[in-house]
Amino acid sequence: MPTVSVKRDLLFQALGRTYTDEEFDELCFEFGLELDEITSEKEIISKEQGNVKAAGASDVVLYKIDVPANRYDLLCLEGLVRGLQVFKERIKAPVYKRVMPDGKIQKLIITEETAKIRPFAVAAVLRNIKFTKDRYDSFIELQEKLHQNICRKRALVAIGTHDLDTLSGPFTYTAKRPSDIKFKPLNKTKEYTACELMNIYKTDNHLKHYLHIIENKPLYPVIYDSNGVVLSMPPIINGDHSRITVNTRNIFIECTGTDFTKAKIVLDIIVTMFSEYCENQFTVEAAEVVFPNGKSHTFPELAYRKEMVRADLINKKVGIRETPENLAKLLTRMYLKSEVIGDGNQIEIEIPPTRADIIHACDIVEDAAIAYGYSNIQMTLPKTYTIANQFPLNKLTELLRHDMAAAGFTEALTFALCSQEDIADKLGVDISATKAVHISSPKTAEFQVARTTLLPGLLKTIAANRKMPLPLKLFEISDIVIKDSNTDVGAKNYRHLCAVYYNKNPGFEIIHGLLDRIMQLLDVLPGEDKGGYVIKASEGPAFFPGRCAEIFARGQSVGKLGVLHPDVITKFELTMPCSSLEINIGPFL
């Protein structure tokens, strides 16, 4: 979830009242948000860089608020305040309007060359806006939040904001060879070619993460005004000539990208959030975008649409019994202007341009549940019998895990996938004899097959912890996978218990004693009768000759124990003797 940092006092001033930390935390919870942290700029720097670096930093209290990833309208102070005020019914949701300019409309002309790299662009103008330092900071921060969220780190959409009074339209969005693009980028003192900029920004902590988007392309996107002044080279950097400041009065906004829908959403969010500060509140000046095919379209769309949802559907999905009128009121509090129409069971909802997250009826139902309050929904027993019970094999696993730990062994959780070498070559077995399930297109050599034994995972864990004090006593109780043509999926899982003892001496007696303890816990007595267990001398390629035994219990073979062969130990990069035990616990249910 994205986190929005807002100044507490500025937030309370905008909300028109002061809250205690506990009260504001409760308000956030009611609105479906979470107050994640109460901190300050000084405290943040102190934690990350130390007290010396924090000297002189601001002590202003900051609220860090977790916002749902699809609520782009809450990524800045303006949207957050507006949403909370509507939720508390202190104000009505504003109506956003697109207006035509008094004079000539600003045009953005897209050329055919952009189709090879970033084919889409939209634009708009915020006219007669009044910034303060805090408003300006919020404007810049919203762009960054959108870049990291819906824009997918500028891969889908990149935002450019420019001082319109320093430019002359119409504007041209085209693509050129890097060597043909030259301009003075933001915060630089001289001009550079695009090639030079890409080299410079490879060491820039902020911009280096975006270079890969275009650096290997033959053409780079660029936007010019009618005088040939570069506005920006999206998605990397804006030009310094048109940089905006606190004193900027007219802003030209362009959004370029590879996703047309998201570009329109991003533009709508920016202009709706900050048109509040325009001379004519909540009005946005239109801009015309001319596409390569000659067709033109006016942006921003600021489209309102209406959806119909039945009241009984909301009640059923949420588990409440509210009248259609009350449900309409709840939805209106969530920035979704609603009214009851028709037969009295239909609710008409107006979706504003700020709520791009409303895609389906279930999104409307969710907002109704939030406004009603999850804590107010009564707990009820389901109409169908759905009482769960623990799976017997998992219950046995949990009991054994606790007792293995009580015996002094440390639990390890290893990957279910491994390399062919781990389960075959290193254990002295041919891969065809393992009945392993193979991954058709493994992304790495470490994940080629599903494990057929837990032993390699534990030995690799020991290898990664060789510096730890001896002895190392590890165990794992997890599934292995074996091919089985008799099952519908062609494979079957078996729950295995594996334990290893690694020390200067093999410690076979410790592993043997552990086996006796496990059988005692499973209520299996020693003996060759049908209900007992016995170990018999055996051989295995992974074990030292004459130091291996097969375990029989309840009339069947359930596993092996013994001292590992020196070759196995060496192949897993170990240097000390090691004993192991591995059994199938399924037959003991």
Curated annotation (Swiss-Prot):
Keywords: Aminoacyl-tRNA synthetase, ATP-binding, Cytoplasm, Ligase, Magnesium, Metal-binding, Nucleotide-binding, Protein biosynthesis. Mg(2+) binds at D357, D363, E366, D367. One of its GO terms (molecular function) is phenylalanine-tRNA ligase activity. It is found in: Cytoplasm. SUPFAM superfamilies: Class II aaRS and biotin synthetases, PheT/TilS domain, Putative DNA-binding domain. InterPro entries: aa-tRNA-synth_II/BPL/LPL, B3/B4_tRNA-bd, DNA-bd_dom_put_sf, Phe-tRNA-ligase_IIc_bsu, Phe-tRNA-synth_IIc_bsu_arc_euk, Phe-tRNA_synthase-like_B3/B4, PheRS_beta_core, PhetRS_B1. Residues 302-379 form the B5 domain. GO terms for biological process: phenylalanyl-tRNA aminoacylation; protein heterotetramerization. Gene3D superfamilies: 3.30.56.10, Bira Bifunctional Protein, Domain 2, Phenylalanyl-trna Synthetase, Chain B, domain 3. The keyword Nucleotide-binding applies. It is an enzyme of class 6 (ligase). Its EC number is 6.1.1.20. Its cofactor is Mg(2+). This is Phenylalanine--tRNA ligase beta subunit. It comes from Pongo abelii (Sumatran orangutan). The gene is FARSB.
